[in-house]
UniProtKB/Swiss-Prot annotation:
InterPro entries: DNA/RNA_pol_sf, DNA_pol_Y-fam_lit_finger_sf, DNA_polymerase-Y, DNApol_IV, PolY_HhH_motif, Rev_trsase/Diguanyl_cyclase, UmuC. PANTHER family: DNA POLYMERASE KAPPA (PTHR11076:SF33), DNA REPAIR POLYMERASE UMUC / TRANSFERASE FAMILY MEMBER (PTHR11076). Its EC number is 2.7.7.7. The active site is at 106. One of its GO terms (cellular component) is cytoplasm. It comes from Sulfurisphaera tokodaii (strain DSM 16993 / JCM 10545 / NBRC 100140 / 7). Mg(2+) binds at residues 7, 105. Signal peptide: none annotated. This is DNA polymerase IV. The record marks 12 as: Substrate discrimination. Poorly processive, error-prone DNA polymerase involved in untargeted mutagenesis. Copies undamaged DNA at stalled replication forks, which arise in vivo from mismatched or misaligned primer ends. These misaligned primers can be extended by PolIV. Exhibits no 3'-5' exonuclease (proofreading) activity. May be involved in translesional synthesis. PROSITE patterns: UMUC. The gene is dbh.
Amino acid sequence: MIILFVDFDYFFAQVEEVLNPQYKGKPLIVCVYSGRNEKSGAVATANYEARKLGVKAGMPISRAMELAPNAIFVPMHKEVYTEVSNRIMSIISSYSDKIEIASIDEAYIDITSKVKNFEEAIELGKKLKREIMEKEKITVTVGIAPNKVFAKIIADRVKPNGLGVVKPEEIEEFIKSIDIDEVPGVGNVISERLHSLGVNKLIDILSVSFDKLKEEIGEAKAFYLYRLATNSYFEPVLNKERVPHGRYLTLPKNTRDIKVIELYLKKAIDEAYNKIEGIPKRMTVVTIMQDLDIVSKSKTFKTGISKERAYTESIELLKQILQKDSRLVRRVGVRFDNIYKSKGLDVFFNS
């Protein structure tokens, strides 16, 4: 197998930097405020300038203010991050039909059938990074390895904006280099128990009896670590329903000319709808404005929507956006979700 893992670098904070270029290069902290006062709540994420000052995700905002009093503190804009994530996931999914979305800012794709060897995989990884940067102005880190776990570990080592590779002939030495705390799924409690057994490296697992390991951390976790240490972990990439069916296109120039925008919107619908295996019940028209702000409008259809009706309904949604927003449009796109698998005559009820 050749697995490619993608991690969006300091994602929430990076989106804020894209939308607010004046934040770039300054300590930036994205917060989840509790509402009691300006210091209550927790840090969601921070850019690398803030991390250098000791700020970490999950830290109380009050503590972050002590460590970085001159930092920029902003509230989370979850809908914006979700929209950007959906667009990036759409790009990633175009590189493989086997995609597993692990979180809002992480995904795995199986590229075994897309490349002949790891050299081609590296070139594909570079191409993916370039496309995401060109279209979304977001840097990502890519890890490539024979399994999902090693792909994530090597990516974590080369962040931010890196590309790390573990080739099959390098696996033996790579396994020896892995600290047990680097392994995904090994939290603080399990880490302490493993260290008490003398397990500091992943390879140290092999020096502990399986029964003892199972007694300390449970059979499932013991088996997981044993398989990693013996290079026998080959869990497949699992396709998840969260993969967005969307397409976004950049206009020739920023404009409010609805006829121009319509042409690109219809093209986006064609490309997105033709990839759907089933019938969508929800459609979202997305516009990215001249300042990279995102404005979207959605509509749900009880029995699903045909491509022909998607054309007409999308124009109505576009008109609603333009009526409420006076800015020029830079990009336009569409997203379909709530897909159901039924095929047949019911789609004509809404055509």
